[in-house]
């Protein structure tokens, strides 16, 4: 890895954070390619050491030579210990820090400590940080690296959920933070009434944000438009834009890139199967799941929903986080059906029962999908956690190819 990464001609980006890494990293890669650059990228989201090594090996020729101007590498937070000792990133994009996989990461402070230790080992690495996240912003300020910020300075949507908020207390002094508004989870405009810690000035500020059938916002007098749903995708797009601009590009081809961008990795991936529109998305922690639900419920037409929950090692065995998700938001009139599947389908069904949401149980994921395509309303959303993602995507690709 050290040998191959040293052959990157210009700069190396790493993308870290709890949610949005894969989408942000792939958009960043596509944006750099739109600027005419050759880029190495771990597109599938394989973000531990083996996945990072594989991205560089697959990008190399048989001679061991790498032909790349840039590298865009998504890195699992805990894996930075192994990756940062072998490559020297020029930029780090920090998306957010939420509670995730408690039995693997433990408390969020452990993740922050790992990141800070590794960031300090690369003191000249510039951090492109979500300034609306008090945890990420504190980390960027505290580690001593140069940093720029991106964020959304005005409230966009009314925050009605009773979400678990991770960054409630000031990391500097322990005082409870005061928020003038929340976007979602702990993202918003915050300040500490005791020590003065506050949301930093935002360098890349999204204004006039619209989140309807598509996303639109203005940054640096440039109107950005993307055919995506979900408020959280404003942050993903904004992070990629901030990365490209920080690297010195004018981002003149950014909207063109967004029009052509196709994730093809189970993140908001769309399929058309026998007349049914299918959207597959990853939901692996409370903050991410709540944003997924909000995006699904933006669609006012009747819909079927399949939720697939596993508890394999990569998911985390502890699925108590399901009780911190606002599943009561699925109580709208336009829900035709909800089916639960996966290893922990019984737990998922119980969780829905506690908020009076009726559901059907089908242990086999393919059977569940075939049933909804066969007798559903023609509009299907499939929400899965990590180890269910690739198997479910393969099923959907297979069904899409059937005549």
Model-based region annotation:
Residues 162-168, 228-239, 264-266:
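Short glycine/threonine-rich catalytic loop with a Thr-x-Gly-x-Asp
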Residues 382-403:
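Glycine/aspartate-rich loop-and-adjacent alpha/beta segment that forms the canonical ThDP
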Residues 197, 210-212, 243-279, 283:
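Gly/charged, well-structured mid-domain segments that form the phosphate/adenylate-handling core
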Residues 74, 95, 128, 236, ...:
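Residue-level signal for inorganic ion chemistry
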Residues 153-215, 227:
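Cys/His-rich short segments
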Residues 86-96, 187-201, 228-259:
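A conserved, hydrophobic alpha-helical segment in the catalytic core
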Residues 264, 282-361, 399-402:
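Active-site beta-alpha connecting loops in nucleotide-dependent enzymes
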Residues 1-151, 159-161, 165, 169:
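Phosphate-binding loop of NTP-binding sites
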């Amino acid at each position: 890895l050290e040998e191959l990464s040293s052959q990157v001609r210009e700069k190396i980006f790493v993308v870290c954070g709890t949610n949005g890494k894969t989408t942000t990293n792939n958009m960043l890669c596509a944006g750099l390619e739109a600027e005419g650059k050759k880029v190495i990228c771990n597109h599938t989201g394989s973000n531990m050491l083996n996945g990072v090594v594989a991205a560089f090996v697959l990008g190399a020729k048989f001679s061991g030579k790498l032909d790349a101007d840039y590298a865009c590498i998504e890195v699992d937070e805990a894996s930075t210990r192994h990756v940062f000792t072998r490559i020297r990133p020029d930029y780090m994009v920090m998306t957010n820090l939420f509670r995730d996989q408690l039995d693997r990461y433990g408390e969020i402070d452990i993740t922050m400590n790992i990141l800070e230790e590794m960031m300090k080992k690369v003191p000249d690495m510039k951090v492109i940080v979500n300034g609306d996240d008090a945890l990420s912003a504190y980390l960027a300020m505290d580690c001593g690296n140069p940093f720029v910020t991106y964020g959304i300075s005005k409230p966009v949507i009314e925050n009605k959920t009773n979400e678990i908020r991770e960054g409630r207390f000031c990391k500097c002094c322990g005082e409870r933070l005061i928020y003038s508004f929340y976007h979602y989870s702990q993202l918003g405009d915050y300040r500490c009434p005791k020590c003065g810690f506050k949301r930093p000035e935002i360098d890349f500020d999204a204004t006039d944000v619209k989140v309807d059938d598509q996303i639109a916002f203005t940054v640096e007098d440039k109107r950005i438009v993307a055919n995506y749903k979900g408020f959280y995708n404003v942050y993903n797009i904004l992070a990629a834009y901030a990365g490209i601009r920080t690297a010195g590009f004018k981002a003149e081809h950014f909207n063109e890139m967004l029009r052509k961008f196709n994730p093809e990795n189970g993140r908001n991936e769309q399929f058309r199967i026998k007349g049914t529109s299918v959207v597959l998305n990853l939901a692996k922690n409370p903050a991410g799941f709540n944003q997924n639900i909000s995006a699904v419920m933006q669609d006012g037409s009747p819909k079927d929903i399949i939720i697939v929950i596993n508890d394999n090692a990569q998911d985390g065995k502890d699925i108590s986080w399901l009780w911190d998700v606002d599943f009561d938001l699925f109580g709208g009139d336009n829900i035709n059906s909800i089916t639960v599947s996966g290893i922990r389908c019984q737990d998922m069904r119980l969780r829905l029962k506690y908020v009076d949401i009726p559901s059907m149980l089908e242990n086999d994921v393919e059977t569940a999908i075939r049933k909804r395509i066969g007798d559903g309303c023609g509009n299907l959303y499939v929400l899965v956690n990590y180890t269910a993602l690739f198997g479910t995507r393969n099923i959907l690709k297979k069904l899409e190819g059937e005549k």
